[in-house]
Amino acid sequence: MPGEDEHQQWVVCEGVCATVAVRRAMLDDGARVSDVEHFEHCYRSFVDYIHDYLISQPGRWLRRLGPRNENVQPAKSSRWDVYHAVQATLAIRLPLWPPTAPALSRGLLDRPEEPAPDKKSWNFFGLRG
């Protein structure tokens, strides 16, 4: 199948976000730092891969790499490329909730363990608990 052996930028970015989220959720649930060491290693591995292969110059990420991490003629860039890069870059610096844009607007950058000061957006289904 064409492209199945490619390494795509968005997949690596999602891996960064997933490792950060699992680590933080486990710590919030009472896990010890030694319990989440594996996720810290995964996070560092993803970030090292991004720096070594995906960032071609400041502000420029390669979208697709071949099986040997060589640049593949990129498809047309889209806003999703930026979305994934921003999410991966900020994941470690923001809390799990609220989502990225609301967390930034509430001043939660570099305060990942702090909940949002207002809880109005925490229950977006309108349920009261």
Residue ranges and their predicted role:
Residues 1-129:
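Glycan-recognition and catalytic cores of secretory/periplasmic carbohydrate-active enzymes
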